[in-house]
Amino acid sequence: MQLNSTEISDLIKQRIQQFDVVSEARNEGTIVAVSDGIIRINGLADVMQGEMIELPGGCFAIALNLERDSVGAVVMGPYANLAEGDKVRTTGRILEVPVGRGLLGRVVNTLGEPIDGKGPIDNDGFSPVEVIAPGVIERKSVSQPIQTGYKAVDAMIPIGRGQRELIIGDRQTGKTAMAIDAIINQKESGIKCVYVAIGQKASTIANVVRKLEEHGALANTIVVVASASEAAALQYLAPYSGCSMGEYFRDRGEDSLIVYDDLSKQAVAYRQISLLLKRPPGREAYPGDVFYLHSRLLERASRVNVNYVEKFTKGAVTGQTGSLTALPIIETQAGDVSAFVPTNVISITDGQIFLETDLFNSGLRPAVNPGISVSRVGGAAQTKIIKKLSGGIRTALAQYRELAAFSQFASDLDDATRAQLEHGERVTELMKQKQYAPMSVAAQSVSIFAAEKGYLKGVALNEIGRFEASLLSYMNSQHTDLMNTINATGDYNADIEGELKAGMDKFIETQTW
């Protein structure tokens, strides 16, 4: 049988058309070393920095070191079943986590998988873990307050929506308690919260989740967990996962709050990974890019303008700004704020709340040191009534500390100095507050008004707590409209001042504390 060239050509074309194969861009490699959660792979020619690599058994690794003849990757989970010679392949994807309202009220791991036993999550999509922070033009200045519910913080170190405020202190000084109370205080405000637990004991995290549930704040909160028993890679990535979940609300014109508890442990996890990858160590054995580790995370917390939200939602949301407020926590060793990681994070954030062991042990809780605590941008966002009333609080406390130190050596004090000392003592006592009892704007205003206008003068130091509780109970029952007005508007004018004064005078007459 003879075929001419035309028939051969037609036959080849026909065969090509009939040929069916699932074409898949694959780039396979071989594991050449496995140790401490780090794998070294040969043969991956086209792998990207940060790309997910599929391992045997459905597990994944992330490519972090791209070298001339091999790739260093960190395993996202258990690595006991991996062995030299196993085949791996690239995926062409970077790590993404589920985002959306379906995550509210849930406890998830770094990868966004539920670990609370409440079934699958109904997410609205996925978002990359690493996202470039909004640019300068896309931002709006901080001008709205976020109430923590703590008098000491809202009066002296106010926090605005879109701000980064560091909570720093030694272990067991109330850092987590302050952050949890700030989350509990948002349950009526509409602000969505994310709590990221890094390198903590599972029992501690379970206690935090239980407290949030007891106080009705869990329904408004996403809890991201990378406990101490989990791989260093998951502890390193957990803050970025939580940030992506918080950004979902920011980008849609809503306000969100994220707590990183704590970034010291994330830095330690990253140091562990870097040393295992044979990266050159620097100060305190941290790698050279540990500053960038935190700066690229915290710069994502911002207040974005109307145009950004409109562009992101393709016109679905108009006239709304969005914000992501960050409360990173750093644990210091013996009060050393000049160590490497604390100084890095202090320089990145917009202020810090310094909690001191000595103050905590002396019974002053929250143990805020007003001398070195500062909020660099929150003043513009402070509620009007708190701003007007709290001007003298910080000054009174600063003068009191100075005079208290001086009075130890001076036997005879003049009347003015003694009056300043007594006022400072009373303000210090008034700043004390119980855990899980955040205060409304109106309640804070009443307490600060009492201190500023001299209503505490005749009250014994050990009765100030009882005096405050009775005063607030009286104002809530007898001046409900005033309290509701202050909570709703935050305004301060002659009428409000007059009504507050009249209420205080009547309460003092009753002597019911």
From Swiss-Prot:
Q: Which domain of life is it from?
A: Bacteria
Main localization category: membrane
| Protein's job | Produces ATP from ADP in the presence of a proton gradient across the membrane. The alpha chain is a regulatory subunit.
Protein family:
Belongs to the ATPase alpha/beta chains family.
Q: Does the keyword ATP-binding apply?
A: yes
Q: Which residues bind ATP?
A: 169-176
Describe its assembly: F-type ATPases have 2 components, CF(1) - the catalytic core - and CF(0) - the membrane proton channel. CF(1) has five subunits: alpha(3), beta(3), gamma(1), delta(1), epsilon(1). CF(0) has three main subunits: a(1), b(2) and c(9-12). The alpha and beta chains form an alternating ring which encloses part of the gamma chain. CF(1) is attached to CF(0) by a central stalk formed by the gamma and epsilon chains, while a peripheral stalk is formed by the delta and b chains.
Query: What Enzyme Commission number(s) does the record list for this chain?
Result: 7.1.2.2
Question: What is its subcellular localisation?
Answer: Cell inner membrane
Q: Is the keyword Ribonucleoprotein in the record?
A: no
Keywords attached to this Swiss-Prot or TrEMBL record, sorted alphabetically, are:
ATP synthesis, ATP-binding, Cell inner membrane, Cell membrane, CF(1), Hydrogen ion transport, Ion transport, Membrane, Nucleotide-binding, Translocase, Transport
Gene for this chain: atpA2
Protein name according to UniProt: ATP synthase subunit alpha 2
Q: Which CDD domains match?
A: ATP-synt_F1_alpha_C, ATP-synt_F1_alpha_N, F1-ATPase_alpha_CD
One GO cellular component term? proton-transporting ATP synthase complex
